[in-house]
């Protein structure tokens, strides 16, 4: 399989049922109607992954403005098991990284992973994520109920490291355009 056979598409009212079905198959938790309403409004932060015009995966994220930080939260990123290890997850993750890079104002990207999901943990570690916390009893109605919090810290640097004037400009549009974005 080549990456050219993998395409990402928008989540729309016409295909939201495919996302619901996919999530039911891929994830051990069920998502409520509000989740899907939010996904429909997420734009570039929610994508279906197609392989030969068949929905085989999806990624859904949201912006989290808590803990005095602006972070990107990966709510779901999953692929049907027959299509795993073919680069589909990587394409979805790279889409999210590109979004974060273009935005230029995220402190980190984070997500929760069930503590026994070694495949997912290794997938994210491959992209520089680290386990930063473990939440006991995070999940309801599934075992194990504990979840690791995985995080990738993002660092923004001004083009001229000898001057901080660029990063303190009052106009946020010029500020974000003036920064270079690097991943730690």
From Swiss-Prot:
Described function: N-alpha-acetyltransferase that acetylates the N-terminus of proteins that retain their initiating methionine. Has a broad substrate specificity: able to acetylate the initiator methionine of most peptides. Also displays N-epsilon-acetyltransferase activity by mediating acetylation of the side chain of specific lysines on proteins. Autoacetylates. Required for the establishment of sister chromatid cohesion and couple the processes of cohesion and DNA replication to ensure that only sister chromatids become paired together. (Microbial infection) Required for optimal replication of E.chaffeensis in the immune tissues, hemocytes, and fat body.
Name the record gives this protein: Probable N-acetyltransferase san
Annotated ranges, domain N-acetyltransferase: 6-155
Broadest EC class assigned to this enzyme: transferase
Residues recorded as bearing N6-acetyllysine in the entry: 47
The entry's keywords: Acetylation, Acyltransferase, Cell cycle, Cytoplasm, Transferase
Subunit structure as annotated in this protein's UniProt entry: Component of an acetyltransferase complex, at least composed of san, Ard1 and Nat1.
Catalytic function, reaction form: N-terminal L-methionyl-L-alanyl-[protein] + acetyl-CoA = N-terminal N(alpha)-acetyl-L-methionyl-L-alanyl-[protein] + CoA + H(+); N-terminal L-methionyl-L-seryl-[protein] + acetyl-CoA = N-terminal N(alpha)-acetyl-L-methionyl-L-seryl-[protein] + CoA + H(+); N-terminal L-methionyl-L-valyl-[protein] + acetyl-CoA = N-terminal N(alpha)-acetyl-L-methionyl-L-valyl-[protein] + CoA + H(+); N-terminal L-methionyl-L-threonyl-[protein] + acetyl-CoA = N-terminal N(alpha)-acetyl-L-methionyl-L-threonyl-[protein] + CoA + H(+)
GO molecular function terms listed in the Swiss-Prot or TrEMBL record: N-acetyltransferase activity; protein N-terminal-methionine acetyltransferase activity; protein-N-terminal amino-acid acetyltransferase activity
Catalytic-site annotation from UniProt: 73, 112
InterPro entries: Acyl_CoA_acyltransferase, GNAT_dom, N-term/lysine_N-AcTrnsfr
